[in-house]
Amino acid sequence: RDFLVLDWFLFNDQRGALAPGESYRPLSSQLRDALLARKQAIPELRILLVTDPINDVSGGDPSADLAALRAAGIDVILTDLDQLRDSNPIYSGFWRAAIDWWAGDGTGPGWLPNPLEGGPSRVTFRAWARLLNFKANHRKLVIGDNSAGELVGIVASANPHDASSAHSNVAIALKGNALLPLLQSEI
């Protein structure tokens, strides 16, 4: 294998408050560990992970998983959501005119509850305000090459997101040139 391209909307362990006796499969750490092991076993393997800024709460709660992947030499790209159409146009206009320039870069100590986690985690006002745009890259795909040099991949409804671990999902496996347009759209 020469390369692996992954594009997932949700790649995190944030799951909100759990009811007594409730648990989730740790999908995000399982995938993180598998990618790190693969990169360590084959250092020349080029791995690209494209994911959404929601995974670090729009900068308000940086993802340790994404940081570990970057530290191992895996390319991690956060989708530039500003390039997407507004899904909440009334708010998004207000965001650009009155909040975006004023709210800083979103780093620093947070004081608002993390909307995605039930624990003590806190995020900045900017993180909350940016999330209200409701923009997201909902793609879920994996493309790589096999030992014969053929393109192989899946397009799925699943996310490596702990709180999504109990969801029912579907996927289609593809092979060959049918994956070229998807691959070209990712790189």
Q: What name fits each language-model region?
A:
Residues 1, 10-187:
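HKD-type phospholipase D/PLD-like phosphodiesterase module
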